[in-house]
Amino acid sequence: VNEPADXXARFTYDXYGLXVVGLIVAAVL
């Protein structure tokens, strides 16, 4: 879905995704 408001949603999704990646890395280590 390409909408003007998607910019903020995408930013939040990226931040959330980064945190998830961090948790996975921490779990592996």
UniProtKB/Swiss-Prot annotation:
GO terms for cellular component: chloride channel complex. It is a single-pass type I membrane protein. Coiled coil: none annotated. The keyword Membrane applies. GO terms for molecular function: chloride channel activity. Keywords: Chloride, Chloride channel, Ion channel, Ion transport, Membrane, Phosphoprotein, Transmembrane, Transport. Its main location: membrane. Phosphorylated by protein kinase C. The keyword Phosphoprotein applies. Signal peptide: none annotated. It is found in: Membrane. Induces a hyperpolarization-activated chloride current when expressed in Xenopus oocytes. Belongs to the FXYD family. This is Phospholemman-like protein. It comes from Scyliorhinus canicula (Small-spotted catshark).
